């Protein structure tokens, strides 16, 4: 109770699995884990899970991996992440700029802060890009930027949760003039 004013607990619900090479890509892509790739079933199951969790009063957080699937689940997401492998991706930065929830951008897989800081700067600004509508048509999207983008320290070659690493991160964020 003493931390209620400072912390909001959310449930991490990740439906997509980032892969360095190959392997199962997650519930949305292959819900039966049998290479049938029934993405329609996966999306419907993902939405059901999100509805069930939010109906319990628990906000949900997820990593946005595929730039198309957020169109079908973002209305049920309270917080999102852009992963270390996609932090430098232009399409993910554009996506982050248009989402209606706070977006954390992870530092690079090596631990480098620059990909995340550059991602935050990009997400804070408006973008124009092609994507799909909910009915599957290609459309041009214009975003207004996401001022609630922030860094996620996920480690790298070494841990980065210590006070010295956090201070270096804060200094780098101030120098880059981002949240």
What are the residue ranges of the model-derived segments?
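Active-site-facing alpha/beta catalytic cores
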Residues: 3-175
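Short acidic catalytic loops
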Residues: 1, 178-179
């Amino acid at each position: 109770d003493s931390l209620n004013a400072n912390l909001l607990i959310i449930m991490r619900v990740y439906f997509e699995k980032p892969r360095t090479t190959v392997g199962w890509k997650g519930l949305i892509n292959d819900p039966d884990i049998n290479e049938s790739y029934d993405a329609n079933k996966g999306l419907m199951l993902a939405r059901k899970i999100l509805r069930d969790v939010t109906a319990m009063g628990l906000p949900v957080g997820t990593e946005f991996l595929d730039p198309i699937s957020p169109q079908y689940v973002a209305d049920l997401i309270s917080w999102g992440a852009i992963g270390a492998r996609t932090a430098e991706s232009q399409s993910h930065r554009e996506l982050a700029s248009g989402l209606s929830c706070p977006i954390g951008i992870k530092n690079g897989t090596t631990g480098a802060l620059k990909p995340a800081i550059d991602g935050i700067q990009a997400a804070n600004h408006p973008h124009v890009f092609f994507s799909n509508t909910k009915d599957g048509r290609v459309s041009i999207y214009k975003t207004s930027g996401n001022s609630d983008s922030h860094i996620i320290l996920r480690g790298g070659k070494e841990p980065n949760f210590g006070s010295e690493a956090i201070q270096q991160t804060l200094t780098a964020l101030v120098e880059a003039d981002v949240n």
